[in-house]
Every structure is written in structure tokens, then in C-alpha cells.
């Protein structure tokens, strides 16, 4: 973000959003020429915000990323660049989607939360409540990884261990993301979960590709 913002004499903005575990953090993003925003998902959901002994891939989430996007949309900005990397999360971007109005349901038709701990019970997703301003925005994802959402080269297997996942956790988290991805793919009518980069930032790349 710094390199881009400073190269074009942009400015920094700060917004209070939810951290990886719901605690409030002050997240920074850049604004260029008044109509373009540049942000790093790690500002709200990064490993840098969590002590190693507190890492928990079942609870860490990207809700704050959605709050950052809403703050940017509130400013009237529709050209957005988002950097993916250094995340403490493995929620497939469900936190961000929930913040933007997407709902998840279990087999009993009850609404459930957006952490991997709760997503293990997902059978349905409702994207009809997605913030309509998202469709007006041009969101460009900046990522240097090509991992798919799930599988042995996916988000959980490759990056889960650095987020606190044990070998057993990795298998569980991978199954959660596989089911989650299949449900969203079926809902939107296209397979995004196997696309290169969908596994970036614990699957946040997938949520941005498939729904946003």
C-alpha cells in the first residue's frame, strides 16, 4: 500500500473495524486521486494482529475486511484494490461476506455464523442481501499466490499451519472449505473454488472472485 500511495501522492485514511477475533482495531487504507482506494486485508485480519499463542483458525475471521470495504463505499469510492496476504484467517472470506450482507444457514434453516467453527454446519447461502454497491465497484485483487480454495495445494494445507492449525486441524478445515465452496459455487452457478488464487488469504480470494 505504501509504495502505491506514496508514488502518486495519495493520502491515508483510518477506520475502526473488527480484528480477527472481533476486537476493534484501527485499519489503514490509501486513497488515490480521491476516487481509488488501496487496502491490505491484513490491516483487519492479519497475522500481525495476533500473538502466536492466541492463533485459532476455527475462530479467526475476515469480518473486518467487509467493514473496511463498506467504509470505502461510504466515501463514494468504487475503484478498489485489495492486497491479499499475511492473513490469520481460514474462513474462505465468509466473515467479509457476512459483513456485506450474505447469510449462511444450517440444515434446520437456522442462520449460522461465519467462522470455520460454525461453517462446518453450512448447507445454504443467501447472497440476495449483498450490499448492492458491491456490484457498482471494480475490485481488483492483488495476490502473488495461485493456490485453489481446497485440496492438498489449497488454503488449509499450505497456509493453515502458520495460522495455528495442527495436521488434524488442516484436514478438518479443508473439508469445511470444500463444502463451503461447493455450496457457493452451486449458488452462483460457476466453479470458482478451483481457480488459481481462490485460496489466497485463507480463501478470501475465493469470496472476492465468486460473490464480489
Regions flagged by a language model, labelled:
Residues 1-84, 88-212:
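N-terminal loops that bind phosphate or other acidic moieties
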